UniProtKB/Swiss-Prot annotation:
Keyword presence, Manganese: yes
Record-level Gene Ontology MF annotations: ferrous iron binding; manganese ion binding; mannonate dehydratase activity
Functional description taken from the UniProt entry: Catalyzes the dehydration of D-mannonate.
Catalytic activity: D-mannonate = 2-dehydro-3-deoxy-D-gluconate + H2O
Cofactor names: Fe(2+); Mn(2+)
InterPro entries in UniProt: Man_deHydtase, Xyl_isomerase-like_sf
Gene behind this protein: uxuA
Coiled-coil segments on the chain, per record: none
PANTHER family attached to this UniProt entry: MANNONATE DEHYDRATASE
Entry keyword Nucleotidyltransferase: no
Gene Ontology terms: biological process: D-glucuronate catabolic process
Superkingdom in the source lineage: Bacteria
Protein name, per record: Mannonate dehydratase
Length: 357
Protein backbone atom coordinates (compact mmCIF):
# COMPACT_ATOMS: atom_id res chain seq x y z
CA UNK A 1 0.00 0.00 0.00
CA UNK A 2 0.94 3.66 -0.29
CA UNK A 3 1.21 5.17 3.18
CA UNK A 4 -0.27 8.66 3.22
CA UNK A 5 -0.87 11.53 5.61
CA UNK A 6 -3.23 14.45 5.13
CA UNK A 7 -1.50 17.84 4.97
CA UNK A 8 -3.18 21.23 4.63
CA UNK A 9 -0.21 23.18 3.31
CA UNK A 10 2.43 25.34 4.94
CA UNK A 11 0.00 28.20 5.54
CA UNK A 12 -2.86 26.09 6.90
CA UNK A 13 -1.24 23.24 8.83
CA UNK A 14 0.63 23.33 12.13
CA UNK A 15 2.72 20.32 11.08
CA UNK A 16 5.82 20.86 8.90
CA UNK A 17 6.57 18.34 6.18
CA UNK A 18 9.95 17.57 7.74
CA UNK A 19 8.13 16.08 10.74
CA UNK A 20 5.78 14.03 8.57
CA UNK A 21 8.85 12.75 6.71
CA UNK A 22 10.09 11.18 9.94
CA UNK A 23 7.11 8.81 10.27
CA UNK A 24 8.46 5.30 9.53
CA UNK A 25 7.63 4.05 6.06
CA UNK A 26 5.72 7.15 5.00
CA UNK A 27 5.18 7.40 1.24
CA UNK A 28 3.78 10.90 0.93
CA UNK A 29 0.95 13.28 1.70
CA UNK A 30 -2.52 13.94 0.40
CA UNK A 31 -2.65 17.69 -0.06
CA UNK A 32 -4.91 20.58 -0.95
CA UNK A 33 -4.97 24.26 -1.81
CA UNK A 34 -6.72 25.52 1.29
CA UNK A 35 -7.26 29.01 -0.11
CA UNK A 36 -9.37 27.77 -3.03
CA UNK A 37 -13.13 28.02 -2.67
CA UNK A 38 -15.63 25.62 -4.26
CA UNK A 39 -15.92 26.50 -7.94
CA UNK A 40 -12.45 28.02 -8.29
CA UNK A 41 -10.11 26.74 -11.00
CA UNK A 42 -6.82 25.36 -9.68
CA UNK A 43 -4.04 26.56 -11.96
CA UNK A 44 -1.09 24.48 -13.11
CA UNK A 45 1.27 26.92 -11.40
CA UNK A 46 -0.51 26.54 -8.05
CA UNK A 47 -0.58 22.75 -8.28
CA UNK A 48 3.08 22.56 -9.31
CA UNK A 49 4.08 24.80 -6.41
CA UNK A 50 2.27 22.48 -3.98
CA UNK A 51 3.82 19.40 -5.55
CA UNK A 52 7.33 20.84 -5.51
CA UNK A 53 7.04 21.89 -1.86
CA UNK A 54 6.17 18.29 -0.97
CA UNK A 55 8.81 16.65 -3.15
CA UNK A 56 11.53 18.95 -1.80
CA UNK A 57 11.02 17.25 1.57
CA UNK A 58 11.45 13.78 0.10
CA UNK A 59 7.73 12.97 -0.01
CA UNK A 60 5.29 12.30 -2.84
CA UNK A 61 2.05 14.18 -3.44
CA UNK A 62 -0.18 11.09 -3.49
CA UNK A 63 -3.43 12.86 -4.26
CA UNK A 64 -5.69 15.82 -3.61
CA UNK A 65 -8.18 16.02 -0.77
CA UNK A 66 -10.33 17.71 -1.73
CA UNK A 67 -11.35 19.60 -4.84
CA UNK A 68 -14.56 20.95 -3.35
CA UNK A 69 -17.72 20.95 -5.47
CA UNK A 70 -19.74 24.15 -5.78
CA UNK A 71 -23.21 24.04 -4.26
CA UNK A 72 -24.77 25.04 -7.59
CA UNK A 73 -23.70 21.61 -8.89
CA UNK A 74 -25.04 19.73 -5.89
CA UNK A 75 -28.31 21.65 -5.82
CA UNK A 76 -28.69 21.50 -9.60
CA UNK A 77 -29.13 25.22 -10.28
CA UNK A 78 -28.83 26.86 -13.70
CA UNK A 79 -25.25 27.86 -12.83
CA UNK A 80 -23.99 24.31 -12.49
CA UNK A 81 -22.60 23.96 -16.03
CA UNK A 82 -20.26 26.90 -15.44
CA UNK A 83 -18.88 25.34 -12.26
CA UNK A 84 -18.65 21.89 -13.84
CA UNK A 85 -16.54 23.43 -16.62
CA UNK A 86 -14.28 24.90 -13.93
CA UNK A 87 -14.01 21.51 -12.24
CA UNK A 88 -13.14 19.83 -15.54
CA UNK A 89 -10.39 22.38 -16.10
CA UNK A 90 -9.02 21.77 -12.62
CA UNK A 91 -8.93 18.03 -13.35
CA UNK A 92 -7.04 18.67 -16.59
CA UNK A 93 -4.55 20.84 -14.72
CA UNK A 94 -4.10 18.17 -12.05
CA UNK A 95 -3.49 15.62 -14.78
CA UNK A 96 -0.82 17.82 -16.33
CA UNK A 97 0.93 17.79 -12.96
CA UNK A 98 0.80 14.01 -12.63
CA UNK A 99 -1.89 13.87 -9.94
CA UNK A 100 -3.87 10.63 -10.19
CA UNK A 101 -6.19 10.69 -7.14
CA UNK A 102 -8.91 13.18 -6.15
CA UNK A 103 -11.14 12.82 -3.09
CA UNK A 104 -14.42 14.75 -3.03
CA UNK A 105 -17.79 14.84 -1.28
CA UNK A 106 -21.32 15.54 -2.45
CA UNK A 107 -23.05 16.69 0.72
CA UNK A 108 -25.50 19.60 1.03
CA UNK A 109 -24.17 22.56 3.06
CA UNK A 110 -22.22 20.51 5.64
CA UNK A 111 -19.24 18.43 4.53
CA UNK A 112 -19.00 16.91 8.00
CA UNK A 113 -20.48 17.58 11.43
CA UNK A 114 -19.36 17.19 15.02
CA UNK A 115 -20.82 18.55 18.25
CA UNK A 116 -17.56 18.69 20.21
CA UNK A 117 -14.06 19.17 18.77
CA UNK A 118 -12.35 18.77 22.15
CA UNK A 119 -14.13 16.01 24.08
CA UNK A 120 -11.92 15.21 27.08
CA UNK A 121 -11.24 11.55 27.76
CA UNK A 122 -10.32 10.06 31.13
CA UNK A 123 -6.65 10.05 30.13
CA UNK A 124 -6.71 13.76 29.27
CA UNK A 125 -6.61 13.32 25.50
CA UNK A 126 -9.10 15.27 23.39
CA UNK A 127 -11.30 13.70 20.72
CA UNK A 128 -13.90 14.75 18.18
CA UNK A 129 -17.41 13.72 19.20
CA UNK A 130 -20.86 13.65 17.63
CA UNK A 131 -24.10 13.57 19.61
CA UNK A 132 -27.38 13.59 17.71
CA UNK A 133 -29.23 14.70 20.86
CA UNK A 134 -27.25 17.95 20.78
CA UNK A 135 -28.07 18.46 17.09
CA UNK A 136 -31.79 18.01 17.78
CA UNK A 137 -31.69 21.18 19.89
CA UNK A 138 -29.72 23.23 17.35
CA UNK A 139 -30.36 25.23 14.23
CA UNK A 140 -27.91 24.76 11.34
CA UNK A 141 -26.49 28.21 12.01
CA UNK A 142 -25.66 27.10 15.55
CA UNK A 143 -23.50 24.31 14.15
CA UNK A 144 -21.40 26.86 12.28
CA UNK A 145 -20.91 28.89 15.44
CA UNK A 146 -20.00 25.78 17.45
CA UNK A 147 -17.40 24.62 14.92
CA UNK A 148 -15.83 28.06 14.63
CA UNK A 149 -15.68 28.51 18.39
CA UNK A 150 -13.68 25.27 18.72
CA UNK A 151 -11.51 25.56 15.59
CA UNK A 152 -8.44 26.82 17.52
CA UNK A 153 -8.04 29.48 14.83
CA UNK A 154 -7.56 26.99 11.98
CA UNK A 155 -9.43 27.23 8.67
CA UNK A 156 -11.51 24.06 8.65
CA UNK A 157 -12.51 22.78 5.20
CA UNK A 158 -16.27 22.94 4.71
CA UNK A 159 -16.66 25.43 7.54
CA UNK A 160 -15.00 28.46 5.98
CA UNK A 161 -16.12 31.90 7.12
CA UNK A 162 -17.24 32.64 3.57
CA UNK A 163 -19.79 29.82 3.76
CA UNK A 164 -21.21 31.13 7.01
CA UNK A 165 -21.74 34.51 5.36
CA UNK A 166 -23.68 32.78 2.55
CA UNK A 167 -25.63 30.47 4.82
CA UNK A 168 -29.12 31.83 4.18
CA UNK A 169 -28.45 31.68 0.45
CA UNK A 170 -27.29 28.06 0.79
CA UNK A 171 -30.41 27.11 2.74
CA UNK A 172 -32.59 28.61 0.03
CA UNK A 173 -30.59 26.84 -2.68
CA UNK A 174 -31.28 23.41 -1.17
CA UNK A 175 -34.93 24.05 -0.28
CA UNK A 176 -36.95 21.20 -1.72
CA UNK A 177 -33.93 19.17 -2.88
CA UNK A 178 -34.68 15.50 -2.19
CA UNK A 179 -32.38 12.49 -1.95
CA UNK A 180 -33.42 11.51 -5.48
CA UNK A 181 -32.63 15.02 -6.72
CA UNK A 182 -29.18 14.88 -5.14
CA UNK A 183 -28.45 11.52 -6.76
CA UNK A 184 -29.50 12.83 -10.18
CA UNK A 185 -27.37 15.94 -9.70
CA UNK A 186 -24.42 13.70 -8.87
CA UNK A 187 -25.11 11.67 -12.01
CA UNK A 188 -25.15 14.86 -14.08
CA UNK A 189 -21.80 15.87 -12.58
CA UNK A 190 -20.13 12.48 -12.98
CA UNK A 191 -21.24 12.07 -16.58
CA UNK A 192 -19.33 15.26 -17.39
CA UNK A 193 -16.20 14.87 -15.26
CA UNK A 194 -15.42 11.13 -15.40
CA UNK A 195 -14.53 11.25 -19.12
CA UNK A 196 -11.95 13.93 -18.26
CA UNK A 197 -10.62 11.73 -15.44
CA UNK A 198 -10.24 8.85 -17.88
CA UNK A 199 -8.31 11.08 -20.28
CA UNK A 200 -6.03 12.35 -17.49
CA UNK A 201 -5.59 9.00 -15.66
CA UNK A 202 -7.26 10.34 -12.51
CA UNK A 203 -9.34 8.27 -10.12
CA UNK A 204 -12.06 10.00 -8.11
CA UNK A 205 -13.20 8.81 -4.69
CA UNK A 206 -16.43 10.10 -3.17
CA UNK A 207 -16.29 10.41 0.62
CA UNK A 208 -19.12 8.94 2.72
CA UNK A 209 -21.46 11.01 4.85
CA UNK A 210 -20.04 11.98 8.23
CA UNK A 211 -22.15 11.09 10.17
CA UNK A 212 -23.87 8.56 7.89
CA UNK A 213 -27.44 9.65 8.57
CA UNK A 214 -29.66 12.65 7.94
CA UNK A 215 -29.14 15.81 9.98
CA UNK A 216 -31.14 19.05 9.83
CA UNK A 217 -33.45 17.42 7.30
CA UNK A 218 -30.80 17.54 4.56
CA UNK A 219 -30.60 14.58 2.16
CA UNK A 220 -27.69 12.15 2.45
CA UNK A 221 -26.68 9.78 -0.34
CA UNK A 222 -23.43 8.11 0.84
CA UNK A 223 -24.60 6.45 4.05
CA UNK A 224 -24.37 2.70 3.43
CA UNK A 225 -23.61 -0.08 0.97
CA UNK A 226 -26.77 0.42 -1.08
CA UNK A 227 -25.95 4.12 -1.49
CA UNK A 228 -22.38 3.42 -2.57
CA UNK A 229 -23.44 0.75 -5.07
CA UNK A 230 -25.95 3.19 -6.54
CA UNK A 231 -23.24 5.82 -7.00
CA UNK A 232 -20.92 3.33 -8.69
CA UNK A 233 -23.73 2.42 -11.10
CA UNK A 234 -24.27 6.04 -12.17
CA UNK A 235 -21.13 5.94 -14.32
CA UNK A 236 -19.53 2.53 -14.68
CA UNK A 237 -15.84 3.44 -14.76
CA UNK A 238 -12.84 2.69 -12.53
CA UNK A 239 -12.41 6.47 -12.34
CA UNK A 240 -15.75 6.69 -10.51
CA UNK A 241 -14.84 5.19 -7.17
CA UNK A 242 -15.14 5.38 -3.42
CA UNK A 243 -13.06 6.90 -0.66
CA UNK A 244 -13.73 4.20 1.92
CA UNK A 245 -13.68 5.93 5.31
CA UNK A 246 -13.98 3.32 8.04
CA UNK A 247 -14.71 5.98 10.65
CA UNK A 248 -17.51 7.72 8.77
CA UNK A 249 -19.28 4.54 7.65
CA UNK A 250 -18.42 2.78 10.91
CA UNK A 251 -20.23 5.40 12.98
CA UNK A 252 -23.41 3.50 12.08
CA UNK A 253 -23.16 0.06 13.72
CA UNK A 254 -25.60 -1.37 11.15
CA UNK A 255 -22.96 -0.91 8.44
CA UNK A 256 -21.06 -4.21 8.05
CA UNK A 257 -17.73 -2.73 6.97
CA UNK A 258 -15.87 -5.96 6.03
CA UNK A 259 -18.79 -7.00 3.82
CA UNK A 260 -18.90 -3.54 2.26
CA UNK A 261 -15.19 -3.72 1.44
CA UNK A 262 -15.57 -7.13 -0.17
CA UNK A 263 -18.64 -6.02 -2.15
CA UNK A 264 -17.13 -2.86 -3.66
CA UNK A 265 -13.41 -3.38 -3.14
CA UNK A 266 -12.69 -3.22 -6.87
CA UNK A 267 -13.92 0.38 -6.88
CA UNK A 268 -12.26 1.62 -3.67
CA UNK A 269 -9.79 4.26 -4.84
CA UNK A 270 -8.68 5.67 -1.47
CA UNK A 271 -8.92 4.56 2.17
CA UNK A 272 -9.28 6.55 5.39
CA UNK A 273 -8.54 4.05 8.16
CA UNK A 274 -9.69 4.99 11.66
CA UNK A 275 -11.69 3.73 14.62
CA UNK A 276 -14.78 5.05 16.40
CA UNK A 277 -16.21 4.31 19.84
CA UNK A 278 -19.96 3.98 20.25
CA UNK A 279 -21.25 5.95 23.23
CA UNK A 280 -24.97 5.49 22.59
CA UNK A 281 -27.49 5.76 19.78
CA UNK A 282 -26.14 8.21 17.18
CA UNK A 283 -23.45 9.25 19.65
CA UNK A 284 -19.82 8.38 19.01
CA UNK A 285 -16.26 9.46 19.71
CA UNK A 286 -13.43 9.47 17.18
CA UNK A 287 -10.94 7.58 19.28
CA UNK A 288 -7.40 6.24 18.80
CA UNK A 289 -6.82 3.90 15.85
CA UNK A 290 -6.25 0.47 17.53
CA UNK A 291 -9.17 -1.92 17.96
CA UNK A 292 -8.75 -1.85 21.74
CA UNK A 293 -9.57 1.88 21.78
CA UNK A 294 -12.93 1.72 20.02
CA UNK A 295 -15.78 -0.33 18.62
CA UNK A 296 -14.38 -1.45 15.26
CA UNK A 297 -12.29 -4.56 14.60
CA UNK A 298 -9.48 -2.91 12.68
CA UNK A 299 -7.66 -6.20 12.02
CA UNK A 300 -10.79 -7.56 10.36
CA UNK A 301 -11.01 -4.44 8.19
CA UNK A 302 -7.38 -4.78 7.13
CA UNK A 303 -7.98 -8.44 6.32
CA UNK A 304 -10.85 -7.42 4.03
CA UNK A 305 -8.68 -4.84 2.26
CA UNK A 306 -5.94 -7.41 1.71
CA UNK A 307 -8.47 -9.98 0.51
CA UNK A 308 -9.73 -7.64 -2.24
CA UNK A 309 -6.17 -6.78 -3.25
CA UNK A 310 -6.28 -3.11 -2.30
CA UNK A 311 -2.84 -1.56 -2.80
CA UNK A 312 -3.73 2.12 -3.17
CA UNK A 313 -3.31 5.12 -0.87
CA UNK A 314 -4.33 4.62 2.75
CA UNK A 315 -3.99 7.15 5.53
CA UNK A 316 -4.81 7.52 9.22
CA UNK A 317 -7.70 9.84 9.89
CA UNK A 318 -8.96 11.99 12.73
CA UNK A 319 -6.66 11.57 15.69
CA UNK A 320 -6.88 12.69 19.28
CA UNK A 321 -5.06 15.75 20.57
CA UNK A 322 -2.39 14.34 22.89
CA UNK A 323 0.76 15.48 24.70
CA UNK A 324 -0.42 19.13 24.72
CA UNK A 325 -0.03 19.46 20.97
CA UNK A 326 -1.52 22.59 19.40
CA UNK A 327 -2.95 21.57 16.05
CA UNK A 328 -6.06 21.55 13.90
CA UNK A 329 -8.80 19.52 15.63
CA UNK A 330 -8.48 15.90 14.51
CA UNK A 331 -5.29 16.56 12.57
CA UNK A 332 -2.42 16.66 15.01
CA UNK A 333 0.84 14.85 14.32
CA UNK A 334 1.33 12.51 17.25
CA UNK A 335 -1.82 10.40 17.36
CA UNK A 336 -2.05 10.13 13.57
CA UNK A 337 1.63 9.15 13.32
CA UNK A 338 1.03 6.36 15.83
CA UNK A 339 -2.08 5.48 13.86
CA UNK A 340 -0.12 5.11 10.64
CA UNK A 341 2.49 2.84 12.19
CA UNK A 342 -0.35 0.76 13.65
CA UNK A 343 -1.95 0.48 10.20
CA UNK A 344 1.40 -0.58 8.73
CA UNK A 345 1.75 -3.24 11.42
CA UNK A 346 -1.71 -4.60 10.69
CA UNK A 347 -0.90 -4.77 6.99
CA UNK A 348 2.47 -6.46 7.57
CA UNK A 349 0.94 -9.08 9.85
CA UNK A 350 -2.01 -9.70 7.53
CA UNK A 351 0.22 -10.13 4.48
CA UNK A 352 2.58 -12.41 6.40
CA UNK A 353 -0.34 -14.62 7.42
CA UNK A 354 -1.52 -14.71 3.82
CA UNK A 355 1.93 -15.66 2.54
CA UNK A 356 2.25 -18.55 5.01
CA UNK A 357 -0.89 -20.23 3.67
Amino acid sequence: MKWGFRWYGAAGDAIPLKHIRQIPGITGVVGTLLNKLPGDVWTVAEIQALKQSVEQEGLALLGIESVAIHDAIKAGTDQRDHYIDNYRQTLRNLGKCGISLVCYSFKPIFGWAKTDLAYENEDGSLSLLFDQAVVENMQPEDMYQLIHSQSKGFRLPGWEEERLQQFQELKAMYAGVTEEDLVENLRYFLERVIPVCEEENIKMGIHPDDPPWEIFGLPRITKNLADLKRILSLVDSPANGITFCTGSLGADPTNDLPTMIREIGHRINFVHFRNVKYLGEHRFEETAHPSVAGSLDMAELMQALVDVGYEGVIRPDHGRAIWDEKAMPGYGLYDRAMGLTYIQGLYEATKAKQNRK
